[in-house]
């Protein structure tokens, strides 16, 4: 078993890490780190458990340690659910010795830090060697993208491989859990929609092109098509919905696009990794699907569901669809865990 820990263990994504790591066949959760306010106390005493499942008994009495490299003990991999401002300061310190699989945004766009979706760009893990050489670390940092970016890019990948994408427009309807438990006051979101999420549109527009780019002699060359995003917070607990419009340079048959999505598999599926969904993208034909309440938990929340796939008659060589992905599973903790499973398998 590989000993692992969670940084930022008391927050919503930290709790999702704990839930997904409980009874994991390869990883044993031995360390929970949080702020100095929580350090030295049992996890069950300091964590206000938010998830709609019971807190695992294995962590209830586990003593929380400070978020400091000297405090985490004998671990091999650390999963980071830290806020971006904290992550930027402390993740490099941990990476001097440990493997850090980070969900935080702080280091994502560093030129020597792999930003990875295992089904999309596993070859970017080659940057680990570059990172260690440049920074003199024994460990390293690997990051996963923004939650909305992950769902979008998983659906774009089979299309990108088969056609030439000219531009992508995406409008997101994002669950409140993406902002954390205290992120959106109930009076601000009930009977309402908030048409702005700070920094979200920029993340989608840059990360998507980065992920679909090429690694050339240690340098990522982003994909060259345009991405335009508009992001909205909606009164849904879990599960981001995205309306996607794609313009291609090529003529296409919509049935071929559907087949490409349905048959899409990546390295995690070939390797049979524990957290890998059987199908990264599940295509549904019902007119009223996908819906977050009905589809966010597809394959344990690790698959993205696509529906309303159709040609767009208003524009040449264009298509549209709607997707739903679980933002704290596939879009956060599950993404980091799948990255770690891949690293554990191939490195």
Swiss-Prot record:
Pfam families: Semialdhyde_dh, Semialdhyde_dhC. InterPro entries: ASADH-related, Asp-semialdehyde_DH_CS, Asp_semi-ald_DH_pep-lack, Asp_semialdehyde_DH, NAD(P)-bd_dom_sf, Semialdehyde_DH_NAD-bd, Semialdhyde_DH_dimer_dom. Its EC number is 1.2.1.11. Signal peptide: none annotated. Belongs to the aspartate-semialdehyde dehydrogenase family. It comes from Methanothermobacter thermautotrophicus (strain ATCC 29096 / DSM 1053 / JCM 10044 / NBRC 100330 / Delta H). NADP(+) binds at residues 10-13, 37-38, 177-178, 327-328. It catalyses: L-aspartate 4-semialdehyde + phosphate + NADP(+) = 4-phospho-L-aspartate + NADPH + H(+). The active site is at 147 (acyl-thioester intermediate), 240 (proton acceptor). This is Aspartate-semialdehyde dehydrogenase. Substrate binds at residues 174, 200, 233. Residues 276-299 are annotated as: Disordered. Phosphate binds at residues 108, 203. HAMAP family: ASADH (MF_02121). Keywords: Amino-acid biosynthesis, Diaminopimelate biosynthesis, Lysine biosynthesis, Methionine biosynthesis, NADP, Oxidoreductase, Threonine biosynthesis. GO terms for biological process: 'de novo' L-methionine biosynthetic process; diaminopimelate biosynthetic process; lysine biosynthetic process via diaminopimelate; threonine biosynthetic process. Pathway: Amino-acid biosynthesis; L-lysine biosynthesis via DAP pathway; (S)-tetrahydrodipicolinate from L-aspartate: step 2/4; Amino-acid biosynthesis; L-methionine biosynthesis via de novo pathway; L-homoserine from L-aspartate: step 2/3; Amino-acid biosynthesis; L-threonine biosynthesis; L-threonine from L-aspartate: step 2/5. GO terms for molecular function: aspartate-semialdehyde dehydrogenase activity; NAD binding; NADP binding; protein dimerization activity. Catalyzes the NADPH-dependent formation of L-aspartate-semialdehyde (L-ASA) by the reductive dephosphorylation of L-aspartyl-4-phosphate. Residues 281-299 have a biased composition (Basic and acidic residues). Homodimer.
């Amino acid at each position: 078993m590989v000993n692992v820990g969670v940084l930022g263990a008391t927050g919503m994504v930290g709790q999702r890490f704990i839930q997904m790591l409980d009874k994991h066949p390869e990883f044993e959760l031995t360390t929970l780190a949080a702020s100095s306010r929580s350090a030295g106390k049992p996890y069950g005493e300091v964590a206000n458990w938010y998830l709609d499942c019971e807190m695992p008994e294995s962590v209830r009495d586990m003593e929380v340690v400070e978020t400091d490299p000297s405090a985490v003990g004998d671990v091999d991999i650390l999963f980071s659910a830290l806020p971006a401002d904290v992550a930027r300061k402390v993740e490099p310190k941990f990476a001097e010795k440990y493997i850090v699989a980070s969900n935080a945004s702080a280091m994502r766009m560093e030129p020597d830090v792999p930003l990875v979706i295992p089904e999309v760009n596993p070859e970017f893990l080659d940057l680990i060697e570059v990172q260690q050489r440049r920074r003199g670390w024994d460990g390293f940092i690997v990051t996963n993208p923004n939650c909305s970016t992950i769902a979008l890019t998983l659906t774009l990948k089979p299309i990108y491989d088969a056609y030439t994408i000219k531009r992508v427009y995406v409008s997101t309807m994002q669950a409140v859990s993406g902002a954390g438990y205290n992120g959106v006051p109930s009076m601000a979101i009930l009977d309402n929609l908030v048409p702005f999420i700070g920094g979200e549109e920029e993340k989608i527009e840059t990360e998507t092109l980065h992920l679909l780019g090429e690694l050339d002699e240690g340098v990522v060359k982003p994909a060259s098509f345009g991405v335009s995003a508009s992001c909205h917070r909606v009164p849904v607990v879990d599960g981001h919905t995205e309306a996607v419009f794609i313009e291609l340079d090529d003529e296409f048959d919509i049935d071929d696009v559907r087949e490409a999505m349905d048959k899409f598999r990546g390295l995690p599926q070939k390797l049979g990794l524990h957290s890998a969904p059987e199908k990264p993208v599940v295509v549904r034909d019902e007119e009223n699907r996908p819906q977050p309440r009905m589809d966010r938990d597809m394959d344990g929340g690790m698959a993205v569901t696509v529906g309303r796939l159709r040609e767009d008659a208003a524009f040449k060589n264009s298509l549209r669809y709607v997707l739903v992905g679980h933002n704290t599973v596939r879009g956060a903790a599950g993404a980091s865990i799948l990255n770690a499973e891949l690293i554990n398998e191939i490195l």
